[in-house]
Amino acid sequence: VINKNSEVYVAMENKEKNTSEDIKLGEQIILSGFQGLDGGSMVILRKMIGNEVRKISDKCEQFETIRLVLKKTHQTEASEVFEVNGNLTDNGKHFNTKVEERNLFLAVSKALEKLHHELEHTRHA
C-alpha cells in the first residue's frame, strides 16, 4: 500500500528481517510495531525519525539501514511503557540500543540519540 503524501509504505514481501507489518520510510528506515499508532502520532514520528536519521547518516561511513522496533510493556489502564529497540548498520558494522520510556516520542528520540552517540564514539575511537 503506497501513501501518496509520503514515502511510507507497508512492505508486502518478506525479505530479510522485514515482515508484512513493517513500515518503511524510504529504502533505509524500517519501523516495526508502529502499525497500531494513530495517524497524528505517525506524522510526528515520521518527521522526527527522518530528521534524526539524516543527521546520523551524515556521520556514517556508508549508511545502510536503521531499524526501530516498538513494544508496549507494563501496560495498565492508567499508563504504558514504550520499549524502543534500535539497530543501525553502517558499512557492515551494527550498533544497537534499547530505551524504555512512558512517552512514545521521548523513547524514539532517546533511541535515535543513543545510536547517534554510539556511532560518533566509535568513529572517534
What does each model-found stretch correspond to?
Residues I2-E83, N87-A125:
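Polyanion-binding surfaces on beta-sheet-dominated domains and ring/shell assemblies
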